[in-house]
A protein has these predicted regions:
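Outer-membrane beta-barrel transmembrane strand signature
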Residues: 52, 157-209, 218-220, 224, ...
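Short Gly/aromatic-enriched secondary-structure transition segments
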Residues: 122-123, 355-358, 431-435, 680, ...
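Glycine-rich phosphate/pyrophosphate-binding loops
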Residues: 14, 216, 789-809
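Conserved small-residue
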Residues: 106-181, 542-545, 550-556, 655-773, ...
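Extracellular/periplasmic, surface-exposed regions of secreted and cell-surface proteins
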Residues: 46-47, 245-264, 300-355, 366-369, ...
Length: 950
């Protein structure tokens, strides 16, 4: 693994780590949440707070070898002391410190080789052509086929080694190009052509620690390098870490500590991946296998995607993070402690990418400028530009608190009170200039065209006061109460401050006298209950209660023109949207009940926990207002969620003679329901600010619901299909093309009184739609096994999801290409493909490819989605179990290494993502269901290394 979050996946219940729509790209990390969805992404964030040695930081930028401990606070009562930044939990990371004694030097390395976990194979060119021709015939086009008999004959001869050319050397297609798709005859596997490389990575770590009774120190440095998996172009990620920590006991009553870290991260990749990484497979999969890699002159065939990848430009980004922290600890009186800490974190981010001209070559070796994907005018044929971005951020935090401990008889008290402040500032500048004169040295200064420049500066601050009381009686009865008073710069006046209480109680039953007979078997049995409330000020707008008027430089492209001619206006001002001055804190309240237990002298340990979390007054959309107002409705505190869930963790550790072994298992589940949302009609979809159709919410909706049709089956004969549609009119379904229904088509269930099969627009009038599944991951689990014997050790880690439904076939809201990897033929000819799985499609008796009456897929149809409605038959079971890691190590006997003055030497071999069990379509990785399987793939990895201590 190359990040801490990857290593944490499946380790503890309730800490959910998922791959996002970026997949395995080098410039992204997995997403994290604690106990499921916290909000609806309608205006605020529900990410957990990550504290590294008491200060917020990026867990994925840390050197894993510097980490001493990671703990997770999940409920509001446990997180109360951390206030307004922690309503959705806290991840506490403690880095290593020095210990008194002689200096200890440690060195470790890791060399790894990675390949993609799942790249589906395309059909060979012959079957691909037959598959597409069958789909064209099914559309009702008669005898007009996509691939001619002559082309298919050349394909067969080429595959048999009887034809030497990948396309007809005398043929021509388009504007005097060699044949490049439907008229060519190569046999390529394009997904593997683009991304199927064994990539190399390495990691090196060096640390020294030690000290005396007064001063202790820890210093470390690390280097990580990881290459990408893409062919034809290089990708790389490099990270450099330097850290130091010093603690000093100045007097008996005063100690000081200082902590500093520097992190440098460099990422390089093709501009093509930076711009189109989210649709990478959507574009590469559209290439036909008969399309040659090279034309007869040795150039890349007319393939803009390949040219953009290899020569379209480069993206380079770097990020420098500086972190410093200083603290003191006073103990002026017995039981009294006074603690203070101040931290400063600054980040400097730089990113530059350039777009070069892309050329294709004719039969006569003449270059022709080609446009990039997407129709962006900035990426038109012949356009070049360079864009440079700089971003400076700084965060300053302070905390000061005192605690006092006092015991009287068997009563123990602890009182804590203090305050903390945070200040965050970000400044960003983006410059763009066209017409680069030297593509080998792209920069703003080596471009001569027009320039675009924009920038921004933003800031926010928080302040909080807190108090905590802890009480326990003989370790049997426990009580804790917290109160916080938090303020934020994001809200106005009376809405700026909020008060948030929490309380927890516990009963250690194993400490009771009546439990003594069972203590030899169960030595820990503790019940605990908690209630807590925290505020969330993490809105996606730093100034959510202020109207902002956009003023931009006018241009014809932006619509900034005068009425009577095309002259540019000097600038354009747009009216600001409405805002609510009453916008205030989201309130996150949790209820928690748990049981901790330990048995058999703590060989068996575990806990079980049940929780409810209410997220109230979330920032959401206001109800629609009349268009006469001339502005969008303001966001308000008008939505709420309730999450219910439970967690279980079990661990066992023991030794039998010289064999030590351990096992752990964790399981968790959570479901979230919308309890308040301004959508009384319960419409399925709405529009976002950019006009895109997105999922809508309503009161009573469970997050993750998948609405679709119930599938009756595939008609085996024309008579069966005609009999069905005579009673159940399916012509009103969206995107049915020529509305031709035959054997091999889907029969949809009629769920209402209307004889027509129709798609409703709301949960109040769904027509024939019903809930067919839920994409929320259910029953997340992880379990590990390990053993050691005479220096040998082995550890295995499994992780997975026991229940999850996903729909990866697209729908009528999305472009045809969204369902291409699942369906193959997916509407239009140029938004379709053919993989091995797609050959399991319905074919009647007498079909030249052989009959297949019990096929999985319906008959394919070019230009129609009639068989590809969201439906129960093709809902995918995305449950999976994955061997996340296996590691085998051997620690050399001390007798072998003492002469070299070595304390410990361990060799290891490791593998990541080596096996996956799932019932999902083989075209998909069950962890990458976003973008309908079109994300950058994950990788499986083999690695080896050594750990040395001296």
């Amino acid at each position: 693994v190359t990040s801490v979050s990857q290593a944490l996946q499946g380790v503890m219940p309730g800490l959910n780590i998922d791959m996002n729509d970026k997949g395995g790209r080098l410039d992204y990390n997995p997403t994290m949440n604690i106990r499921g969805t916290g909000n609806l992404n309608t205006g605020s964030s529900a990410s957990p707070l990550v504290l590294i040695d008491g200060a917020e930081g990026d867990i994925n930028s840390l050197n894993p070898q510097d980490i001493a401990n990671i703990s997770v606070l999940k409920d509001a009562a446990a997180s109360a002391i951390y206030g307004s930044r922690a309503p959705f939990g806290v991840i506490l990371v403690t880095t290593k410190s020095g210990e008194a004694g002689k200096a200890t030097i440690q060195y470790s390395n890791n060399f790894r080789w990675s390949r993609p976990t799942n790249i589906p194979d395309m059909l060979d060119s012959y079957r691909f052509a037959k598959y597409f021709n069958a789909a064209q015939k099914n559309s009702g086009s008669g005898t007009t086929f996509i691939f001619t008999d002559d082309t298919i004959d050349r394909i067969q001869k080429y595959m048999a080694g009887e034809y030497p050319y990948t396309s007809d050397p005398n043929g021509s297609q388009g504007n005097n190009f060699f044949p490049f798709n439907v008229a060519s005859n190569d046999n390529q596997n394009w997904p593997r052509n683009f991304i199927d490389k064994t990539s190399f990575g390495q990691e090196h770590n060096l640390s020294i620690s030690g000290g005396g009774e007064k001063v202790k120190y820890y210093l470390s440095g690390a280097f990580l390098s990881q290459d990408g998996q893409m062919n034809y172009s290089d990708e790389s990620k490099k990270r450099y870490n330097i850290s130091g920590k010093v603690t000093g006991q100045v007097t008996k009553w005063l100690s000081l500590d200082f902590n500093a870290r520097f992190i440098r991260s460099d990422i390089e990749m093709p501009t093509f991946v930076k711009l189109y990484g989210d649709r990478f497979f959507a574009e590469t999969t559209k290439l036909y296998p008969m399309m040659p890699l090279y034309d007869n002159n040795g150039h890349y065939t007319r393939n803009p995607k390949l040219m953009q990848l290899t020569s379209g430009g480069r993206s380079n980004s770097s990020k420098d993070t500086y972190f410093t922290s200083g603290g003191f600890h006073l103990t002026p009186l017995k039981g009294l402690g006074i603690h203070g800490q101040a931290t400063l974190r600054t980040e400097s981010y730089r990113h530059q990418y350039n777009v070069n001209k892309v050329y294709l070559y004719t039969r006569d070796n003449q270059p022709v400028e080609e446009a990039w994907l997407g129709g962006d005018p900035d990426l038109a044929a012949g356009k070049t530009f360079v864009q440079s971005q700089t971003q400076q951020t700084s965060m300053m935090t302070t905390s000061l608190y005192a605690d006092y401990e006092y015991s009287w008889n068997k009563h123990n008290f602890k009182v804590t009170a203090g305050m903390n402040t945070e200040y965050y500032y970000i400044n960003e500048l983006i410059g763009k200039r066209y017409d680069v004169i030297n593509e080998n040295v792209p920069s703003i200064n080596t471009a001569t065209g027009t320039s675009d420049l924009k920038g921004s500066s933003k800031e926010w601050a928080t302040m909080g006061y807190f108090a905590r009381l802890n009480y326990d009686y003989e370790g049997r009865y426990l009580l804790e109460g917290n109160i916080r008073r938090d303020g934020t710069s994001r809200f106005r006046g009376n809405q700026r401050w909020g008060t948030f209480p929490s309380v927890s109680i516990g009963w250690n039953i194993a400490r009771e006298a009546f439990w003594s007979p069972a203590e030899a078997y169960v030595n820990l049995l503790k019940l605990r209950f908690s209630y807590g409330s925290l505020g969330n000020q993490n809105t996606d707008n730093y100034y959510p209660t202020y109207s902002i008027q956009n003023i931009t430089v006018g241009s014809v492209d932006a619509g900034g023109r005068w009425l009577l001619d095309l002259a540019n206006k000097s600038n354009i001002a747009s009216s600001p949207g409405l805002v609510s001055s009453l916008l205030t804190w989201e309130r996150v309240t949790s209820y928690n009940a748990g049981l901790d237990f330990g048995a058999f002298n703590n060989r068996l340990n575990g806990y079980v926990e049940y929780y409810i979390r209410d997220t109230k007054d979330m920032v959401g959309p206001a109800e629609e207002i009349t268009p006469l107002v001339g502005a969008s409705a303001p966001k308000m505190n008008n939505t709420s969620l309730r999450t219910k869930g439970w967690e279980l963790q079990l661990t066992w550790q023991d030794r039998i003679g010289k064999v030590g072994y351990h096992a752990s298992f964790n399981l968790s589940d959570a479901q979230t329901e919308v309890t308040e949302y301004p959508n009384p009609d319960k419409t399925f979809y709405t529009k976002d600010g950019d006009g895109n159709t997105i999922e809508n919410y309503w009161k009573g909706k469970k997050l993750g619901e998948i609405w679709g049709f119930k599938t009756v089956g595939i008609a085996k004969t024309d008579e069966e299909m005609q009999s069905w549609i005579a009673q159940h009119d399916q012509s009103k379904l969206p995107n049915v093309g020529n509305n031709i229904w035959k054997a091999g088509d889907i029969m949809y269930a009629n769920l209402d009184d209307n004889p027509a099969i129709e798609k409703g627009t709301s949960a109040t009038d769904p027509k024939d739609l019903t809930i067919i599944g839920n994409y929320t991951p259910r029953f997340r689990f992880g379990f590990s096994l390990g053993a050691d014997y005479k220096g040998f050790d082995i550890n295995l880690m499994f992780q997975g999801v026991a229940k999850r439904d996903v729909w990866v076939g697209g729908d009528d809201r999305t472009a045809y290409s969204k369902g291409m990897i699942f369906w193959g033929i997916n509407g239009g000819q140029w938004d379709s493909t053919g993989y091995e799985e797609h050959m399991d499609y319905f074919r009647p008796e007498g079909d030249e490819m052989g009959a297949n009456l019990n096929a999985y897929y319906p008959r394919p149809i070019i230009g129609s989605k009639q068989n590809q409605q969201v439906q129960s038959r093709y809902l995918q079971n995305a449950a999976y179990i994955r061997l996340k890691n296996i590691q085998i190590g051997y620690t050399l006997p001390k007798a072998w290494i003492q002469k070299a003055n070595l304390e410990k030497v361990r060799l290891f071999f490791s593998g990541d993502n080596l096996w996956t069990g799932t019932k999902m379509s083989k075209n998909f990785d069950p962890e990458l269901i976003y973008q309908n399987g079109m994300s950058y793939p994950l990788s499986y990895t083999l690695s080896c290394g050594i750990n040395i201590t001296l």
